[in-house]
Every structure is written in C-alpha cells, then in structure tokens.
Amino acid sequence: MQQGDLYDHESLVKAIKQVDVVISTVGHGQLGDQGKIVAAIKEAGNVKRFFPSEFGNDVDRTHAVEPAATAYATKAQLRRTIEAEGIPYTYVSSNFFAGYFLPTLAQAGATAPPREKVVILGDGTAKAVFNKEDDIGTYTIKAVEDPRTLNKILYIRPPSNTLSFNDLVTLWEKKIGKTLEKNYVPEEEVLKNIQEAPIPVNVILSIGHSVFVKGDQTNFDIEPSFGVEASELYPDVKFTTVDEYLNQFV
C-alpha cells in the first residue's frame, strides 16, 4: 500500500513512482483537485494508465442543466488536461450505479421500490443503463492492461441492463404481480422543480433530467474512434442483470 496526500505534491509523486496504474475514486468535492494527480503523474513519468474519477455519464456527450452541468464540466476539463499532457488514460463511463437507483426505482425519498404509485420523469421512453457496483469494478480492473481500452472511453452498457423507465416499471410490475399508478412529469415541470429544489435534491433531479428525459446515457452510438463497450470486450464476465437485481426486493 502506497500512501500519498492529494494536497502534498512530493508525497503524491513518491507514491505514484511505485505504481504503473493510477485509478482515482475521489468524491464530488475533490473532482477539481485531480489536476494535482495529473501533475504528479507527469512528474513521476512512469504511469502506464490513468483512470480519473468518472464512473457515470460520458461528460463529453451530455445535455445536463445546472447544477449537474458544472460537475460534468469539471470532469470534461480534466479530460482535456490529461490529453494535453499526453498521459495514457481510460475513462470509465459506467452510467448508473444499480445500488443507488434500483432499490427505490429512483423514487425521491423512498426506502423501497414502489408498490402503488410511481413517478416517471419525461415520457419514460429514454433508455438508461443500470450496473451493479461490483461489476463496474470487475470491468475496470479488466481494462487496466488491455491495449484495446488505451486512450478510450470504456462504456459499461450491457444490452440487458439498458432499459427505459417504462421498461423498468413493466419489469417490476411483473415481479410483484400488480399494475402501478403512473405519474409522468413533463420536461417543463422537471426543469421548474430543479430550479426550486434545495441542494442536493436539485443535483439528483438534474442528473435524472439528463438521463431519463434527454437520454444522455444512450442517445449516441459508441464509435471505435473514441470508445469500446465492456460487455462486448469481456463476454466472459458474468454480470448481474437488472432483472436479477430486482429479485431481492420482491
């Protein structure tokens, strides 16, 4: 275990000199400070791959409004810095963490999936991607020494985990054997709610708008020039499907 302080350049360089790969998992508050990691990697000169703290939407292909837009812009700016410095990288676009959204079907303030009513942002047709956190970790480690992921975006977008909100609700209804009352929230109302909501509700809503209304996780094709898809690269990995994941809540 190598120790280094994000805010102590010398200690960071010393730690990074002992490794070949740097995977950053800093939280929201430190996203902008990853430039310090880039500077240390540049000075150390030995790192073969850097994975910045991404693990969400592809920040170069988003239609997010504030306040999510600022967080995405911070990540995008770091990408440009990494590229300008010539540091070998992989950006992991893992889309949604299943554990954050599926236990409640993304219902605000809920502690369990809905049994009577469900709120759906937009018309429910935009497709989103839900991946179990363990599987995201597995795919990330697989990518570490894979030349196919070098200087590429690794999208974790298995077809069986790519569902519209309507698909998700239908799947859940089949499992519990009943039909839910559906409340569709039009985009104009979603945007109004974002502007009026306090932190962190406005952040969550703006991410929901980006994904469930604008379809930012799936409204583009993965082109070989910039990206690869994890379940295609590693068909041997047995990942948890959304269908399987929801069984624990029935």
Indicate where each model-derived feature is located.
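Extended, non-catalytic subsegments within catalytic or DNA/protein-binding/adaptor domains
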Residues: 69, 132-133, 225-228, 239
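Amphipathic terminal alpha-helices
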Residues: 227-250
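Glycosyltransferases and closely related glycan-assembly transferases
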Residues: 37-45
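A short glycine-rich beta-strand->turn/loop micro-motif centered on a GG-aromatic cluster
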Residues: 53-55
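Non-catalytic, hydrophobic alpha-helical segments
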Residues: 22, 136, 168, 242-245
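N-terminal Rossmann-like NAD(P) cofactor-binding module of classical short-chain dehydrogenase/reductase
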Residues: 16-25, 51
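Oxidoreductase cofactor-interface core, primarily capturing Rossmann-like NAD(P)-dependent enzymes
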Residues: 1, 7-15, 28-32, 44-48, ...
